[in-house]
Structures are given as structure tokens and as C-alpha cells.
Amino acid sequence: MSFEIGGLRTTNERLLIMNKKKIDYRFKILYAVAILMVVAGHCDGGGISLDFAQWFPYEGIHLALFTFCSGYFFKDAALKRPGRYVCKKLRTLILPMYGYTIAYGLLVRLLHRWGFQIGGKFNLHNILISPLNDGHQFVLNMAGWYIVPLFMVEILNCMIRAFFKRKGWQIPEWIFFAGAVLIGMGGNFLAIMEYRTSWWLTVVRILYFAPF
């Protein structure tokens, strides 16, 4: 039972609210480190050199770090209703992706009218299909390529775990990790063999992020 005295909640209720709003600042720091890595890796294109890859080869792991941070907050409660989890991810990742794709497409179309030659045409293929297998169609939205692989890795992780849970199979966590590492190695192998165009590119990206 809860009650208020002079507008103040009971101590237990205040503690409960504080716990719900508790922030893990370790992951805030990890996100900040990953952002700095991404910025440093792309500064050369603007004439500023912040690249320290000669000291530490970070360019292959900064987005993987984002994937790790996202996966850390996965809750087993999602395994009870995986359909709801999928709908949530569609709402928070895929729908916004298509929203900003349309916005960037309209901006690029406007720039074309002003004489700027940047990005592709504003058509159904570039709006609906290209975000799934490339993500570079309007140039200005190039960073959006990461959304689909992240979405697929999160969905596959949930679906695989939910399948085993419903079967009643207790799979040790190290087996999940070992399998994911093998999948990631398969993605690297496909990339080395130059299977990294069109839909193959999407597959390689998903496989690469699987271990994280």
C-alpha cells in the first residue's frame, strides 16, 4: 500500500521509482567510446586527421561495440512473447529507418533541382529495397545501413532462444556464443571471397555482427 504525506511518497515507493530510472553509466561510456571511434574513422574525408588506427585497429569493431551494447539490454521476458518483441523492433528501428529514408530522398530530389549531383533517384526501389541491401542510395543517409543488420541480429537472437525455450531445451550460454562466433567467421569468409554486393552484402553484415 502506498500513501503520500504532504505530497511526498513513501520511502519504498521513491526507491522503486529510482530503481526503475537507474542508468548504467558504464554503457553510456561505451557508447561514447564507440561514437569517438566512428567520428575518428571518418574525419579524413573532411580533411581532418583523427585516425589512430595505426595504434589500435578499431575500425572493425566500433559498430560491433554498438551491437554489443544493444544486445546487453536484451531481457529474457521477450522470449515469452517473441511476436511482441518483433513488433517493438519494427516500430523502433525499421519504421524510423523508412521515415528518414523518405526525408533524405526528398532532400536529395530538391538538391537535384538546384543542380547538385548527389544521391540516387527518388523512386520506390531506392525507398523500399535499397535500405535493406545497401543503405547508400541517397548518400546523405549512408550511416543508415547499420539499422537492418542490427535489427536482424536482434530478431534472430530472440527467435532462436525462444525456439529452444519452448522446446524445453536448456542450452548453455557458451554454446550460443560459440555458434555465434562460427557464424561471424562465416561472414568474414564470405567477405574475403568478395560476396559483398547486393543481398550478399546484407547477409555478410548480419553474420559479422552475430557474435556481438
Where are the regions a protein language model picked out?
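Loop-centered beta-sheet repeat module
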Residues: 176-212
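Membrane-cytosol interface segments of multi-pass membrane proteins
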Residues: 1-183
